[in-house]
């Protein structure tokens, strides 16, 4: 699994844990948490399109937590090299999928 997968999952987990309190130093519509500003962008982009922006996804440290859905990762047709959060049973689990899939994304920068 590529490094971008780990980064993407880390961002999704980070966004889900945000308190919702806006910091005084973040622009309007951004959320401050632990010294960084975060924003969810609802427009859908591939990983490569989102990566072209000037924002950092995370500190690029290795993941030490995994929450794969049952039977995942299964790399269908040797084409599923990215991960998204999926809730087939009401609980968010990881599922591998093609990297060209479109999803909302989160950007972050240090204050």
Swiss-Prot record:
Disulfide bond annotation, renumbered to this chain: 26-37, 82-99
Tissue specificity statement from the Swiss-Prot or TrEMBL entry: Expressed by the venom gland.
Top-rank taxon, per record: Eukaryota
Keyword Secreted tagged: yes
Subcellular location, principal: secreted
Cleaved signal peptide residues: 1-23
Family of the protein in this entry: Belongs to the true venom lectin family.
UniProt protein name: C-type lectin lectoxin-Enh1
Organism whose genome encodes this protein: Pseudoferania polylepis (Macleay's water snake)
Lineage of producing organism: Eukaryota, Metazoa, Chordata, Craniata, Vertebrata
